Amino acid sequence: MAIYGIGTDLAQVSRIAAVLERTGGRFAEKVLGPDELRVFHARRARSEARGIAFLATRFSAKEAFSKAIGLGMHWPMTWRALQTLNRPSGEPYVIASGELAAWLDARGITARVTVSDERDYAVTFVVAEAPDDVAAARSGAAS
């Protein structure tokens, strides 16, 4: 396996909060997958700030992932097709669905993700890995 791509994103929590307020909550429904949306609602019910921070980290994760795979937010990369969830240990991981999952599987691409947030910002770092020949083809190196 080799590095296929690296992506990072920094989201301003207050900006995410403003968009959420302006859209009456529709922003969360547009961006979050079903499992993420359940966690968002549960966290927001306990603490508005923690709910918004969760939304900011997940928005940031999708942006960083889209950069790591080199597509940006273009088909098959869609907001709801990628979810960042947490293992019982707290470790974040990504799970793709639909056409994005098929696209990743066809290329043997996997990813590692880390997310962090403070009061003002959420940051994500993603490393996408693929078989050596796939990663080399993307980088333009001779196979």
From Swiss-Prot:
Recorded GO MF terms:
holo-[acyl-carrier-protein] synthase activity; magnesium ion binding
UniProt cross-references to SUPFAM superfamilies, sorted A to Z: 4'-phosphopantetheinyl transferase
A Pfam match is ACPS
This entry's Enzyme Commission designation comes to: 2.7.8.7
Keyword list, A-Z = Cytoplasm, Fatty acid biosynthesis, Fatty acid metabolism, Lipid biosynthesis, Lipid metabolism, Magnesium, Metal-binding, Transferase
Q: Which InterPro entries match?
A: 4-PPantetheinyl_Trfase_dom, 4-PPantetheinyl_Trfase_dom_sf, ACPS, Ppantetheine-prot_Trfase_dom
Q: Which positions does UniProt annotate for Mg(2+) binding?
A: D9, E63
Its catalytic activity? apo-[ACP] + CoA = holo-[ACP] + adenosine 3',5'-bisphosphate + H(+)
Q: Which Gene3D superfamilies match?
A: 4'-phosphopantetheinyl transferase domain
Q: Which family does it belong to?
A: Belongs to the P-Pant transferase superfamily. AcpS family.
Query: Entry's HAMAP family?
Result: AcpS
Name the record gives this protein: Holo-[acyl-carrier-protein] synthase
Q: Which organism is it from?
A: Burkholderia pseudomallei (strain 668)
